[in-house]
Each structure stands twice: as C-alpha cells, then as structure tokens.
Regions:
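N-terminal Lys/Arg-rich, disordered targeting/topogenic segments
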Residues: 1-19
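Glycine- and acidic-residue-enriched helix-capping/strand-helix junction motifs
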Residues: 78-91
Length: 274
C-alpha cells in the first residue's frame, strides 16, 4: 500500500513537470515573438517612406530664415593655396547675404558676429539653432596636395538616418545643379557625398550608399535643427578652379548659384541678375 502511494506521487510529479515545461515554452514563444515585434518596430521607426530622389520638402510661408555659415575665420584660416579658404568663404557668404537681403522671401542669418571671429562648429550650430532656421548652408573650400590636379564642386548633406537627411539631400541636389549650370565640374556621384568620422579618421562615402551609420558626420550638420549642407565650392589649390569660383568675381558667381539653389528649394523666383 505504501509502495503504491509512492508510485502515485511520482506519477503526479511527472505530470506536473510536463505541464510546467509547456507553460515555459509558451511564455518563451510569446517573449520571442514580442521581442521580434519590438525589433521590427524599432528598425522601421523614423525610416523614410519616400525615396531620397523622390522626396520634396514641405514648404511653409515666407519669409524663410536662411543661415549662412562661412567656414573657418579668426584664428582658423582653413586651407591655403591660390587663395586662403577663410577669405574666400567670407566673400562668398557676403555676396550670398546681399542677394537674400534684397529678396523679400528670405531673411539671411549668420553663425558669428563677424567673419574674423573664431567659433567652433558646435558653437556655430548652437547659434544657428537659436535663430529658428529653415535652412543652413555652410560654405567651405577644398584643397589637395601640391602637384594634384584635383578640381570641382562637391557638397555634403546631413547623412542618412538623421532627422533632416532628406531635406538636406534635396538641397544638395539643388546646389549641385546650380553649380553645374554655372560651369563647375561635379565630383563623385552628382557632386553629393557623405562624410563620417571614425575617431580622427575622415571617411568619404558616395551618396549611393544609403545605410544608416552610427559614426558622426560634420558637427554643424549633426547639431543644427534644420536641413543643412556643407559645400566645397572649389579647390583653393587649383588655379583654374579659383579663377572660376574662388576669385572676387568667382565668389560672386558662386553666391549667385547658391542663391538660385535656395530659391529652387523654396520654390521662389530668383531676382534677376544685375
């Protein structure tokens, strides 16, 4: 009798273990399914529903607030060549501001009190954000080692995965098109590239690469709260490039192209050339 009782208890214990295992398996399945759901939701959250090349920005009412960021200046002269980069960017920014000031559709803004003052990129981005910008253009010049024949225009929009990437990419297309119409040769894929920093190493990536990466790009593009593009208007180390886009007349020519690109972005009619 005692033996039979022990066997019954063992049988019950065995049935209890099987039921518990089933519960654990069901809970595991639910947990894995829910985890996959969360992963898919996280992956798709914030992803663009329109392809970059088909994107068009939503335009509000003018006047539009345009931040013009003249690269370098003050204690940072930038690249040196046929011209000094900071002098070229200041001249271009000044000419672009003049066009925007005459056009009632725009309010030109800056990231520094003067072109001769020194400000870090993060400080310039903060100054831009404080002015509630609709668009930012950071003006720079390119350079190459002595003996290089490198020339041409290229620009860098905010990279894929960032909040303002598509608006930045659209603006970059307008800039590249306007510069090409002005006679510039376009570098890379249509004059548009991405930049990533891996520590102190800068990696250039063609705009055909759409993957989202964790590395940061240019600080001013990462930190500003609006579509933004950094433009390299010409190589300061190229006589031909500077004559066309970096000399006194060249800076004015570039500024006009930038102005027309801004007008194309906001779908306004440019003022006639003088």
């Amino acid at each position: 009798m005692a033996k039979h009782s022990v066997q019954c208890k063992r049988k019950k214990r065995g049935n209890g273990f099987s039921f518990g295992s089933a519960v654990v398996l069901v809970l595991c399945f639910i947990g894995v399914s829910f985890g996959l759901y969360l992963w898919q939701a996280a992956f798709s959250f914030g992803q663009p529903t329109v392809d970059d090349d088909d994107f068009r920005p939503t335009i509000g009412e003018p006047p539009y607030r345009i931040v013009i960021d003249a690269g370098h200046g003050g204690s940072d002269p930038g690249a040196r060549g046929v011209v000094q980069e900071s002098e070229m960017t200041a001249a271009t920014a000044e000419a672009l501001s003049a066009w925007l000031e005459r056009d009632p559709n725009y309010i030109p803004l800056t990231t520094r009190e003067s072109y001769d003052s020194t400000a870090k990129p993060a400080e310039r981005a903060a100054a831009a954000n404080a002015q509630d910008p609709d668009l930012l253009l950071s003006i720079h010049g390119n350079s190459a080692p002595e003996g290089s024949s490198a020339a041409g225009f290229e620009c860098y929009p905010a990279v894929p995965g960032r909040a303002y990437h598509q608006g930045s990419y659209y603006f970059a297309n307008q800039l590249a098109g306007a510069m090409q119409a002005a006679g510039a040769s376009l570098r890379g894929r249509g004059g548009i590239r991405y930049i990533y920093y891996q520590g102190e190493v800068k990696q250039l990536v063609e705009s055909s690469h759409k993957e989202v990466r964790v590395e940061r790009s240019f600080t001013i593009l990462e930190d500003v709260n609006c579509p933004a593009v950094l433009a390299e208007q010409c190589f300061v180390t190229s006589d031909t490039d500077v004559a066309q886009f970096g000399s006194e007349d060249g800076c004015k020519r570039t500024a006009r192209a930038y102005y027309e690109a801004i007008c194309a972005y906001f779908e306004t009619t440019p003022l006639p050339e003088e």
